[in-house]
Amino acid sequence: MTESLLYSGKAKNMFQTDDPEIVHIHYKDQATALNGKVKEKIEGKGQLTSHISALLFNYLTVQGIENHFQKELENGDALVRKVKIVPLEVVTRNFAAGHFASRFNVPMHKALKPAVHEFYFKSDSLDDPFINNEQILALEIADKKTISQMKEEAELINQKLINLFDQIGITLIDFKVEFGFTSQGKLLLADELSPDNMRLLDKESGKSLDKDVFRQKIGDVRIGYQTVLDRLNNKLIAGEN
């Protein structure tokens, strides 16, 4: 099987397979911060990210949320459906953190009810700026139907993930998702689902189990990722037996 590189990003490489509708993803052993301005090689992180993402995509599939994930390969890589990504990040916030907390001068981890959904324009050169519905429409990035569908899907995903993480002793602070269109014009959840793009706190200790550990330089990011993976495995895999 011959593959050609489609995309090389901060966290993953994507290759075109012999099937025009299927893409091969390889997750890098790398952590980044400040939109890629800070990066560090971390051995084994790629497989942790891939395993967690596979478990969460499969869980959401069972929950009725369609996504691009197809299968995880033996080497820890993944096969996904090829989509044309909408250049928008959808960030869902259940508790104040990061830029939201500083922007509005609210206490860290203040509960947000209802959950806040925000759009950010995908542009490394512009540092992924916040963008509102009217700006999205004016710049012809997406139409009203797509904007509405993405927000509705983000809310559904939020409820499903809150429920899952609550059962394994983890609080879902916030997360980022992306969506893309298949060649048939169907909008699917895409990209990845891992502690790289969500904030997770251990309910008992209050410790971060996500990339904030790397951003804030407070330890080995793999420890938190492994904790998340172990708990998801125990719940979703071992729990089935």
UniProtKB/Swiss-Prot annotation:
Keywords assigned: ATP-binding, Ligase, Nucleotide-binding, Purine biosynthesis
Enzyme Commission number(s) of this protein: 6.3.2.6
Molecular function, one GO term: phosphoribosylaminoimidazolesuccinocarboxamide synthase activity
InterPro entries the record matches: SAICAR_synt/ADE2_N, SAICAR_synt_PurC, SAICAR_synth, SAICAR_synthetase
Pathway named in the protein's UniProt entry: Purine metabolism; IMP biosynthesis via de novo pathway; 5-amino-1-(5-phospho-D-ribosyl)imidazole-4-carboxamide from 5-amino-1-(5-phospho-D-ribosyl)imidazole-4-carboxylate: step 1/2
Catalytic activity: 5-amino-1-(5-phospho-D-ribosyl)imidazole-4-carboxylate + L-aspartate + ATP = (2S)-2-[5-amino-1-(5-phospho-beta-D-ribosyl)imidazole-4-carboxamido]succinate + ADP + phosphate + 2 H(+)
Pfam family, one: SAICAR_synt
EC class: ligase
Top-level taxonomic group: Bacteria
Single biological process term from Gene Ontology: 'de novo' IMP biosynthetic process
Family, similarity comment: Belongs to the SAICAR synthetase family.
Name the UniProt record assigns to this protein: Phosphoribosylaminoimidazole-succinocarboxamide synthase
Annotated source species: Oenococcus oeni (strain ATCC BAA-331 / PSU-1)
